């Protein structure tokens, strides 16, 4: 009986949260949510959290706030306020479950939209790398963001970025070239790889030249 009473809040929260998961799936499939539905799902997610404090519920709440911010316009006053709520919810999720590479990256991306300082963004990016160095879903966009705030990285951390660049290159030459197809990116990549991975850099340059 005692075991059942302990488990019941978790079960009740999971059942309550089903509509939120359905809504998040719609967002992931780029299917629009009416504003009223998104607002209702936010309240449902908050109720799930009140029933059982779970990192996934906080992450879903963050996603819903982010979705609403996008609909309002990220740089509008309303959008900025919603982004702050999205960031707060993401931090709560990471407090409960820190080993979430995708969410650390998402939080760094939100920081960019909130005009946070590069060193603040860099810390989240490093956490994303440390908790998921081979997380292919965020490997390339994370690297693009890292390169945009490169001066905030210490030398030891730049060595980590060099390894990440090699991993992304080895994963798919075609996707790498598409993602980093600009002289500015290649200048930065060259600076990172010249001493640490000269042969890989030579291979990159050769393939980039054949595409132009």
Q: Which residues fall in each region the model found?
A:
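Extreme N-terminal leader/anchor segments
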Residues: 1-16, 211
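Alpha-helical repeat scaffolds
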Residues: 1-6, 38-48, 78-92, 119-129, ...
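A general structural-boundary detector
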Residues: 7, 48-49, 73, 115
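Amphipathic alpha-helical repeat scaffolds of TPR domains
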Residues: 11-29, 50-73, 97-110, 136-148, ...
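Charged/polar, solvent-exposed surface patches and flexible loops
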Residues: 22, 26, 43, 64, ...
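Conserved alpha/beta-domain cores
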Residues: 31-37
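Non-cytosolic head/periplasmic domains of membrane-anchored proteins
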Residues: 76-147, 153
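Terminal, low-structured helical/coil segments at or just beyond the last alpha-helical repeat
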Residues: 149-212
């Amino acid at each position: 009986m005692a075991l059942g009473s302990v488990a019941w809040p978790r079960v009740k929260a999971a059942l309550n949260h089903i509509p939120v998961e359905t809504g998040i799936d719609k967002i992931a499939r780029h299917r629009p949510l009416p504003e009223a539905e998104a607002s209702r799902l936010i309240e449902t997610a908050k109720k799930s959290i009140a029933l059982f404090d779970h990192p996934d519920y906080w992450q879903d709440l963050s996603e819903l706030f982010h979705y609403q911010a996008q609909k309002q316009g990220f740089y509008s006053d309303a959008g900025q306020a919603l982004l702050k709520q999205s960031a707060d919810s993401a931090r709560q999720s990471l407090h409960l479950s820190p080993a979430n590479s995708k969410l650390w990256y998402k939080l760094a991306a939100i920081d960019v939209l909130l005009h946070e300082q590069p060193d603040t963004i860099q810390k989240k990016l490093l956490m994303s790398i440390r908790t998921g160095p081979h997380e292919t879903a965020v490997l390339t966009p994370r690297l693009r963001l890292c390169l945009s705030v490169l001066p905030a990285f210490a030398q030891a951390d730049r060595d980590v970025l060099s390894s990440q660049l090699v991993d992304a290159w080895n994963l798919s030459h075609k996707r790498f070239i598409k993602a980093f197809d600009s002289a500015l990116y290649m200048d930065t990549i060259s600076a990172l790889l010249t001493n640490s991975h000269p042969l890989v850099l030579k291979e990159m340059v050769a393939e980039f030249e054949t595409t132009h």
